[in-house]
Swiss-Prot record:
It holds the Pfam family CoaE. ATP binds at A28, S29, G30, K31, T32, I33. Belongs to the CoaE family. Gene3D superfamilies: P-loop containing nucleotide triphosphate hydrolases (3.40.50.300). This is Dephospho-CoA kinase. It comes from Prochlorococcus marinus (strain NATL2A).
């Protein structure tokens, strides 16, 4: 359940001159594909929170050092002193099975992601329209950065199928990933547009073409 303060925050929208299209949805709902489609069609710059989270765990960052100290060799892909790389699958397995560990990791990654989004918005301020792909847009209170929010809607069965195929997860692990986010039904209430990605690609393509007039 969310309280009135959270509800008010979820209703916030960016009121500046730049049009900022927020794209969000459940895990494996098709956010990146849809963002890429808009970029190919309109050449609008894309700011991708997942990309910045990936950067946060790149070699030799301060965040990586903290992760190494906390979890040790079990999350290191290469044990060479000169080339220690985070095993993201091993790390994900830890945090999605333990809420405290998940909160700890998010607590050090999200400030970095926030900073990168701010930096990229500054670089893109001359563009009249930008796209922000943010998986945890509602959960982490990014609604005030967006002029409008497109929620990519697809059934849980499709999310599970994609997660198992894409990330080689068991059905239990795939369900854990989905359950770690807010329910789709809740997030849809606070979106401005619902993009249907439950059928073939033409369905959402037609929606976007109509919505953004191309």
């Amino acid at each position: 359940m969310i309280d009135q303060k959270q509800t008010n925050n979820l209703c916030l929208r960016w009121k500046g001159k730049q049009r900022r299209i927020g794209i969000t949805g459940g895990i494996a709902s098709g956010k990146t594909i849809i963002g890429d489609f808009l970029f190919q069609a309109k050449q609008w710059p894309i700011l991708d929170a997942d990309l910045y989270a990936h950067e946060a765990l790149s070699a030799e960052s301060e965040i990586v050092k903290k992760v190494w100290l906390r979890y040790g060799s079990k999350i290191i892909k290469n044990s060479s002193k000169n080339d220690q790389i985070i095993n993201r699958k091993a790390l994900a397995k830890i945090v999605f099975q333990n809420e405290l560990e998940k909160k700890w990791l998010e607590g050090i990654i999200h400030p970095f992601v926030n900073k990168r989004i701010e930096e990229e918005l500054e670089k893109s301020k001359s563009n009249s329209i930008v796209i922000l792909i943010i998986p945890l847009l509602f959960e982490k209170n990014y609604t005030g950065l967006c002029s409008e929010i497109c929620y990519i809607d697809c059934p849980r069965s499709m999310q599970l199928k994609r997660l198992q195929s894409r990330d080689n997860l068991s059905i239990k692990e795939a369900n854990q990933r989905i359950d770690a986010q807010w329910a789709n039904s809740l997030k849809k209430q606070f979106a401005d547009h619902i993009i249907n990605n439950s059928n073939d690609d033409e369905t959402w393509k037609l929606q976007l073409k109509k919505l953004y007039k191309f």
